[in-house]
Amino acid sequence: MGKIVLRLDRMMVERKMFLNELAERVGISNVNLSKIKNNKVTAVRFTTLAAICDALDCEAGDILEYQKDS
C-alpha cells in the first residue's frame, strides 16, 4: 500500500515562510509542525490541514502527495 506525504517544504519555500511563522499562524507548536513537515506523524487533523492551507494560501492537493510502494 502506498502512503500520503506532506510537501510543506516546497510550499513554504514558494511562500517564503519559515517554520516559526507558519506554526504561529496555524496555532501549533514548532515541534509539532516540524513533525508534520518531516512526515513523522501518522495522522493530521483536517482542522490543522485547513489552517496550514489558509496560512500558505494553497489547496490541500498542493501539499499532499500520494507515493506508491516501490
Outline where the language-model segments fall.
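Short alpha-helical DNA-recognition segment
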Residues: 17-35
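Residue-level recognition of specific faces of alpha-helices
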Residues: 32-35, 48, 62
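Short, basic-rich loop-to-helix N-cap that marks the start of a DNA-contacting helix
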Residues: 40-51
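Residue-level detection of the helix-turn-helix DNA-binding "recognition helix"
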Residues: 13, 27, 38, 68
